Amino acid sequence: MQLRLSSGNILNEKVHKIGIIALGSFLENHGAVLPIDTDIKIASYIALKASILTGAKFLGVVIPSTEYEYVKHGIHNKPEDVYSYLRFLINEGKKIGIEKFLIVNCHGGNVLVESFLKDLEYEFDVKVEMINITFTHASTEEVSVGYVMGIAKADKETLKEHNNFNKYPEVGMVGLKEARENNKAIDEEAKVVEKFGVKLDKELGEKILKESIDKVIEKIKEMIR
């Protein structure tokens, strides 16, 4: 079967060899404003939008996610579980002509799988890259992005509730003592949230989403050169 590779609004025919995968987390507390699957929804939104605007193939989502042992705000898997799922997606992607894979990751703990990417490249003889787009957990940036996407319940009352760090210790990781003690970056971010609180900024959310999608598009353009 001769496929019409030039059809549609695509960058060029080479883009059909690029596959985009969304990576996030499904089971994580995000305060009162955001749902537990916020990270994978943001990753999917960005990845799918970039796919639509370029013609690259959106291959779907990775269901498992991983996290540092000292960050306790959800239910996660081992890095090896994420690796195994990526193996499945890459193996299936190769069958439809994908030669280069771009993982859009929107969950900080998943950076633990980056060390496996070279193994995937070697095993399948493909290119595998990962873009990390992450925010201070359940804080102003993530709340604002979620609001623009339509997944945040950010009315005045709920936002006030969200800022109760005793009830929602995962917000900004302010109340996650073990995480703050073990990770300086987490502690610094938590201090900012403690000082300024979590606010809704629609313009900021729109700006972050656009910049994130543009970042993925630029990477796709780079991969087809």
From Swiss-Prot:
Fe cation 2 binds at H30, D39. GO terms for molecular function: 2-amino-5-formylamino-6-(5-phosphoribosylamino)pyrimidin-4(3H)-one formate-lyase activity; ferrous iron binding. Fe cation 1 binds at E28, D39, H107. The gene is arfB. It catalyses: 2-amino-5-formylamino-6-(5-phospho-D-ribosylamino)pyrimidin-4(3H)-one + H2O = 2,5-diamino-6-(1-D-ribosylamino)pyrimidin-4(3H)-one 5'-phosphate + formate + H(+). Keywords: Hydrolase, Iron, Metal-binding, Zinc. Gene3D superfamilies: Creatininase (3.40.50.10310). It is an enzyme of class 3 (hydrolase). Its EC number is 3.5.1.102. Signal peptide: none annotated. This is 2-amino-5-formylamino-6-ribosylaminopyrimidin-4(3H)-one 5'-monophosphate deformylase. The keyword ATP-binding does not apply. NCBIfam families: ArfB_arch_rifla. Belongs to the creatininase superfamily. FAPy deformylase family. Requires one Fe(2+) ion for activity. Requires an additional second metal ion that could be Fe(2+) or Zn(2+). Catalyzes the hydrolysis of the formamide of 2-amino-5-formylamino-6-ribosylamino-4(3H)-pyrimidinone 5'-monophosphate (FAPy) to form 2,5-diamino-6-ribosylamino-4(3H)-pyrimidinone 5'-phosphate (APy).
